[in-house]
Amino acid sequence: KGSALFISTPRGMNNWFYRLWVDSENKEDWERFKFPTIANPRIDPEEIESAKAELGSITFAQEYEAEFVNETTQIFKADWFKYYKPGVRSCKIGNDEFLMDDMHKFATVDLAVSTKDSADYTVITSFAHDSATNNLFVTDMFRDRLQAPDIIPTLKKIFYDNELSWVGIERAGYQLAIVQFAQREGIVVKELKADKDKRSRAMPLSAKFESGQIYFPDDELATWVGEAEREL
């Protein structure tokens, strides 16, 4: 016999800490406590509200409200999707117009090397970022199954056609070779760390969608938008 104290921030429900939390409710010799950040009188409530806007409701519930968030909780919701009207080298939201020449343009790359029907797609997503509003406009998306020799020519064309400043590629496994070949072709590459699972890496993007700062084009020529929304 003895005593034990278990302290942790909740992280999903498929783990020993959640099971311990649930089981302890009905054990006479156990006590359980939950202390959300707001319970700390030394922390400014305005700072907490600011964190909620920055992190999004899902991460905020876990990190600040000490809630167990189900791993199957949908992190992208359809009513978060917003749209802009493409103009002549501009993006329009209502009466506001954002000039492409004034924005920072880049792309992220999710690589897959195979043309088999069962293989994943290589996805290259181009963005334009307005620093004044922090709005992020999705301007283009390439999605197809590619063999390794076709990746660099495709990436190079997108890099120059969309006037990108850089492309982000994860530095992991065979992708390191892709990074090196891309740099040799004059493509500016920002190496991204793959140090988290895909869901964790998607949470900052989820927060920006929820805050209404990511926009898809409202354009019938952008046939990839529907597929992108379904993938999310």
Model segments located where?
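ATPase catalytic-site recognition across NTP-hydrolyzing enzymes
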Residues: 37-111
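Short, conserved catalytic or adaptor-binding loops enriched in Gly and charged residues
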Residues: 20-28, 96-98, 182-183, 207-208
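Conserved beta-strand scaffold positions in the cores of enzyme catalytic domains, especially
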Residues: 4, 32-35, 106, 189-191, ...
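ASCE P-loop NTPase helicase motor core
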Residues: 1-51
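An active-site-proximal beta-strand-loop segment
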Residues: 109-124
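Short amphipathic alpha-helical segments
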Residues: 17-20, 120, 179-182
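Mg2+-dependent endonuclease catalytic cores in nucleic-acid-processing enzymes, primarily RNase H-like
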Residues: 67, 71, 75, 123-125, ...
